[in-house]
Amino acid sequence: MEWTDEGIVLGVRRHGEGNAIVELLTRLRGRHLGMVRGGASRRQAPLLQPGNTVSATWRARLDEHMGNYALEPAVVRTEVLMRAPHAAFGFTHMAQILHLLPERDPHEGLFLTVGAILDAFENRESAGRLLARFELALLAELGFGLELETCAATGRREDLVYVSPKSGRAVCGEAGAPYADRLFALPRFLVDGTAPPAGDVEDALRLTGYFLLTRVLEPRGLGLSDARAAFISAWRRSIAPA
């Protein structure tokens, strides 16, 4: 068995004498593990840093085996992630959440989303918005997508300003006004892609964090990661007026 694909390094752990098990989010084969011989060496360390995109050739005798990876660099992002603390914390959080994807289940759209986010993550003005969009995309990939295009109460597509914490559906201003204190704000940029103010990004992270916690993490006995909290703190500092 053999194939070649693009992959984003999610994590690495030592295996035996000098080898490493590498976890990739591949473009066509989803989250996939493989052994890299000599992967624990200093020579291989720069290539195997989480966040890098690699060209991966996987070989195994049978498809169900873990198999071996031969990796070549495609996009090296180590310097960017080290230079921007919010980006490093953000990708750590993303990798931890991506680990919840079923192994070898294709998610090409999510692969493209993660790659695009990593390429723009250093930009402090867009980092918070990008993380919220990632969490929204991940919820959809896991079967818990939010419905933000029409009002749950009226079916209208206009004046969508709230989200119900129970249904995960948008609610228009008129229908939601009596219950506003029990609803989440719906930031416009999650619907129309416009550039948001910082307050809208905070609202978006509050929204996606709630559904990530209640629909994905808590049923698995997990909570929101420390890396996510560290990202939000670092991002807030990065955009604060000097």
Curated annotation (Swiss-Prot):
It comes from the Bacteria. Belongs to the RecO family. Pfam families: RecO_C (PF02565), RecO_N (PF11967). One of its GO terms (biological process) is DNA recombination. Keywords: DNA damage, DNA recombination, DNA repair. Involved in DNA repair and RecF pathway recombination. This is DNA repair protein RecO. The keyword DNA damage applies. GO terms for cellular component: bacterial nucleoid.
